[in-house]
Amino acid sequence: AESILYSHIPGYEGPSPKQDAVENLKKAIKLSNPQSQPLKLVSEKFFKEQAHLKTSTKIRKTNNIQDFMKWIGMVDIREIKKVHAGNYVTYLSESGKMAHNTLSNKVSDIKSLFTWAESRGIVEYNPFVKVLLPKKAKKIKRIPWDNNHILTFLNFPKIEFNDIAATAIAIYTGMRLDEICNLKFDDIYEDAFHIHEGKTESAARTVPIHSILSNLLTQCESKSKDGYVITGLNPGGYDQKRSWNFQKRLGRLRKHAGLPETVVFHSLRNTFATRMENLGVPKNHISQLMGHEDGNMALDVYSGGLAIEPLRESIGRLSYGHEVDAL
């Protein structure tokens, strides 16, 4: 600080000030002007108006905008131009292997800050509008698991009880991993799984328990110390999902077991749907069991949905053959 203050005085013999320190001081003085619009303060005002956001979304937006602020430094938001936006996207795309959706979310979150600032008259335009992202890599098409995939995975030496239980519930119910991980024994009654909420409105549903799962669920209950069907999971991610770390574990196991990239846990839902369709189960039954809101599998029923008994009969028809059913 002393070198910055006195270095311009004739006869000063102290150390020369560091250039970055000088620049930061200049920025700080500039931003202290009452007419300035520091990016940090504008972002704080922005988030005060974002109370409606889900916790996970707000945390993600906060992190992504803070990362941008660290990159660009102390600036007046009005000084940020399209060249800065373009350079930041290039920086992100070249800084390491990043999924296209992750990059898109980062840019979208920052863009939302500038959209808000423009609507408040703080900036004249949004520099992140029409900033092109790198081309998305060709998506790997997921395929349903066949019996060989299922047997290879479930017989893999490093598989543990929770891995088997989650996989079995998935192939005999079509449930999402997050739904399976959030299942409590309090949600199991009248010989059915009762899912109270989920990814979509139609995710709340009742799924009859396949007879093959009965013994497995008894074992799950005897092992559970927290009331969950899949017990002892460590939550993770922005919103502390129980499935967060477990999903990563299952991915590593699939890779080590030698399953192809096209076979992921979520494609067990495709496996369930395909098997049910091949059995001639009506599509509206499959749709309700899976909690679909896909237009191709829209419910042809009243808003109350189908009665439980027709669904129980449909799910009872499902079989993967003796080898899988006996596991």
PLM feature spans:
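Basic, Lys/Arg- and aromatic-enriched nucleic-acid-binding interface segment
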Residues: 100, 104, 119, 123, ...
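Catalytic-site neighborhood detector that most strongly recognizes the C-terminal catalytic loop/helix
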Residues: 144, 197-201, 290-320, 324
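Short, aromatic/basic-rich helix-turn unit that serves as a nucleic-acid recognition element
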Residues: 37-65, 95
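Conserved tyrosine-mediated DNA breakage-rejoining catalytic core shared by Y-recombinases
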Residues: 149, 173, 182-218
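N-terminal helical hairpins
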Residues: 1-37
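Active-site/catalytic core of tyrosine-dependent DNA strand-transfer enzymes
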Residues: 210-260
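C-terminal catalytic core of tyrosine-transesterase DNA break-rejoin enzymes
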Residues: 168, 172, 179, 267-293
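Short, polar N-cap/turn motifs at the start of nucleic acid-interacting alpha helices
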Residues: 187-190, 260, 281-301, 323-327
